[in-house]
Structure formats: C-alpha cells, structure tokens
Amino acid sequence: MTHSPLAQFDIKKLIDIKMFGFDVSFTNSSIYMLLASILALTYFYLAFYNRKLVPSRLQVSAEIVYNLVADMLNQNIGVKGRKFIPLVFSLFIFILFCNLLGMTPYSFTTTSHIIVTFTLAILVFLMVTIVGFVKHGLRFLTLFLPHGTPLWLAPLMIVIELFTYLARPVSLSLRLAANMMAGHVLLKVIAGFTVSLMIYLKFLPIPIMVILIGFEIFVAILQAYIFTILSCMYLNDAINLH
C-alpha cells in the first residue's frame, strides 16, 4: 500500500500527546497547518514591513490579495462588510497557503481532510449565525421564510430553508476536501505512469505533467476563492436578510 495514491493522505503521529483522555497528538497535518500559518505571516510581514510609495513586487502582490478579499466583501455585503475583512482575509489566506503548500513534493495537503475543512466550515457557520442573531435578534429567523411565501406553503418552505441552512457547512467542507483530494490522486496516478510512458513517448509525458500541475495549482487557488466567496454570501444573508 506504500505506492497507493491514497497513501499521501495518511495522518501520522509525530509527537504522541494525551490530554484529559483525548488524543491531541502533534501530527504531520498539524505541522503543515502550522507551517502554512508561519509562511503566510512571514510573507505579509516582509511585504508590508517597509512599505514604500513605489511598492515592491512583493508589496504589490500582497495588496492584490488583500484587495481581492476586500472587494469580495464589498460586492456581496457592502460597507457593512468592512468590519469582517480581518476574519475573512485570514480564512482565505490560511486555506490558500494550505492548498499551495500541499503542491510541494513530499508534503501533506491538510485541506484534503474533511475534519479540517469541516472545522473551518463550522467556524463560518457559527459566525454567520451569531452575527445574524446579534444584528436582528429573533427576526433573523425570517431568513427561513422567503418573502411572499403563501401561508399554506410556509411550513414546507421553513423545513426546506432550515435544511439548506444546516447543510451549508457540509457542502462547504466537502467541496474543498473532495476537490483537493481528487486532484492530488489524479496527479499521483498519472505521475506513476509517466516513467513507463517515457519509454514509448520519449519526453512527451513531462510537459503533460507540467500542465496538470499548473492546472492543480489553479484549482488550489480557485477552491480557496470559492470557499471565501461563499462565506461572504452567507454573511450577506445574515446581515442584510435577503
């Protein structure tokens, strides 16, 4: 099973830790999440430590990422969304760096595990729910009854809307984990055949692998964007009660 495409997703204990009867061991998943956080902090520290009127390439790239998140919130929520920029920006950067770090050879893709993505999705779900109740009180419950719904159809619509609302963290987490896992499995399988194919096709498989890796990097960035834009849309529902 060493060469199984799924072996790359195995969680391995590095430091065995038990606390109050719970297993809180430091694993390869933990170290890559920590590494992603450190790399993200280092990147933005270097980008903004010595800001100049004529920005460096690093500063420009960091500002582009920041403006991307700010525009997402502005387009979905408006001015009211500005206060959520730090939280949503941190979420986007963490997922982005975890995804990209998983593209490096012999690394570990933390976002391919449903427990990681579900935890992030639950945080978004709780944030949206708390914001909704704090801002609107019990009127937030009107979210589950679309405006203009006939009275006789109200019970069914409430059940459907409630189910849809509760399913948000599930769909949000599954989408990210499934896409990251599928892409990495595909790369692993094709890479396994590359050496054999080179006997018959010479160097043709190499540019194909480069293209596939480039596409997977694009998917890694896209999935971080999708997770974040959906989080902004959910926040908009809670703030503006559409």
From Swiss-Prot:
InterPro entries: ATP_synth_F0_asu, ATP_synth_F0_asu_AS, ATP_synth_F0_asu_bact/mt, F0_ATP_A_sf. It is found in: Cell inner membrane. GO terms for cellular component: plasma membrane; proton-transporting ATP synthase complex. The keyword Ribosomal protein does not apply. The keyword Magnesium does not apply. Belongs to the ATPase A chain family. F-type ATPases have 2 components, CF(1) - the catalytic core - and CF(0) - the membrane proton channel. CF(1) has five subunits: alpha(3), beta(3), gamma(1), delta(1), epsilon(1). CF(0) has three main subunits: a(1), b(2) and c(9-12). The alpha and beta chains form an alternating ring which encloses part of the gamma chain. CF(1) is attached to CF(0) by a central stalk formed by the gamma and epsilon chains, while a peripheral stalk is formed by the delta and b chains. Key component of the proton channel; it plays a direct role in the translocation of protons across the membrane. This is ATP synthase subunit a. The gene is atpB.
